[in-house]
Amino acid sequence: RLQGDWSSDVCSSDLFYPGHTMVTAPEILFFWVARMIMMGYEFRGEAPFTQVYLHGTVRDIKGRKMSKSLGNGIDPLEVVEAFGADAMRFTIVSQCAVGTDISLDHENVEAAFANGRNFANKIWNAGRFALMSVGDAPIQPLDQLRGDLAEEDRWILSRLSHATEEATRGLERFRLHEVAERLYHFFWGEICDWYLELVKSRLNVEADEASREAARTTLVTVLDGAFRLLHPIVPFVTAELWARLPWPDGAQRPEDLIVAPWPMPADVDRDETVEADMAGFQSLVTEVRRLRKEYGVGEGQRIGLSVQGGPEGFFDSLSVRAAAVEQLARVDRIESGAGAGVGANAVLSNGAELFVPLEGVIDVERERERMQKEITRLEGVLAGVEKRLANEQFVSNAPEEVVNTARENAAQLQDQADKLREKLAGLGV
C-alpha cells in the first residue's frame, strides 16, 4: 500500500519525506536514483533527498568485486563474531575515501580487520583504565575547576576542541575516512599516549585533592566528548563505556549515548600557547626515546639531557615539567646548554637542540665499531648501484622505472651513510 499509494497518510506526511541523504552505489545512479528524483517531483513536487553519497565497492586485493561465483567474499557476520561489529565498522570506514573502492583480503581476514580490532581494543582498555582511575564519585563541573587545571588538562581540552571541529567538518563533507583517521589519532595518539600517561600520578588517592579533582573532571569531560565523536563509527564499545562515566551532581544526563547531543567545539578551551609548549615537550620526549633506541640504551637506564635554543622560555617550561620528562623519557637530569663529550644530538620541532651524553651509558667503542661496519657495508652497496648507473647501456636500454628506482636507491643509501657518519662524529670519531 505504501509503495503504490503516494496519497496515504504516511507517505503524504513530512515525517519520512523528504529525506536528507541517499547512500548508494554508483552503478545504480541512473537506473534508480535519478528515477526516484523524477518520481518525487512528479508526485510530491520536490526531490526525495537533497544529497547523494556514492560509496565505494568492496573488492579483494586483486581488485575484483566480491561475489559468490568467484568465492572471494567475506561474510560480515563471521567478522562480527570474530572481531566485533566495531572493528568491522572502523576498518571499512577508515578505508572509504571518496572516489575509491575498499580493498580487503578474503584469504587473510584477521589481517584485513586488524586495524579496527586493535583500535576497538584500545578504546575498551583505555576506557576501563580511566573508569577505574576516576572512580564512581560524581565529578565537579568543569567551569568550577578552571583555576585548578594543570597545563596538560588545558592542552587536552584544547585538542578536544580541535578534534570536534575537524570531525564535524569531515562528516558534513562526507569525508568519513578523514574523520576516522582524525579520531584515531586523537584518542590513541593524544589521549592514550600522552594525557593518560601525564595524569596517572594525579589520579592516585594520595595526590593533592584539588589536582586530583581537576584531573578527574578533565578526563571524564574528554572521554565524554571522544565517545560522542566516535559513536557513529564504533557505537557499541563507546556506548558501554560512556554509560559508566561519572556525572556531576544534578546534571541532566541523556538516557543513552545514541541520543546524546553531538558535541560542539568549545572556543573557551582553545589555548594555542599551551599547545605550542606541549608540542615542544612531545618532540623532546619523542627524540630522546628515538635516541635511546638507536643507541641501544636499556629501558631502566637513566640518562642526562642538555637543551639549548628554541622559543623563548622553552627551557623554563621543561623545568616545570621536569617530573614528566623524567618519567616519560627516563631522564635523571635536565641541563641548559650545548652539552659536551661523547653523545648524541637531535633538533626538536621548535628548533631547540638536544644533547644526550652517552659516556658511561653505552659501550662507546663497540658502538663505533658497529657504525663503521654498517657505513662500510652501505658504501659497498652504493658503489655497486652507482657503477650500474654509470653504465650508459643500462641507462639507455633499461625501462625508465627501473632506472628511477636505482637512482632513488642510490640516494637513500647515500643518506643512510651520511646520517651514520654524523652519529659516528658524535661518538668522537
Q: Model-flagged regions — what are they?
A:
Residues A120, L160, T164, L183-W188, ...:
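Short amphipathic alpha-helical coiled-coil/interface segments
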Residues R1-V10:
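Single conserved hydrophobic/aromatic residue that forms the stacking wall/gate
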Residues V58-K62, M66, L70-G147, W247-R253, ...:
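Catalytic adenosine-cofactor/nucleotide-binding cores of aminoacyl-tRNA synthetases and other
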Residues I28-G45, V285-L291:
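Metal-dependent nuclease catalytic cores in nucleic-acid-processing enzymes
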Residues V93, N118-L131, E151-A163, E181-R202, ...:
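Core structural elements
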Residues D60, A137-T168, L196-T286, S306-P311:
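Acidic, turn-prone loop/beta-hairpin segments
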Residues R244-V429:
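C-terminal low-complexity, glycine/proline- and small-hydrophobic-enriched intrinsically disordered tails
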Residues V23, E107-F113, H162-L183, A226, ...:
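Extended, non-catalytic structural segments that build the interaction scaffolds
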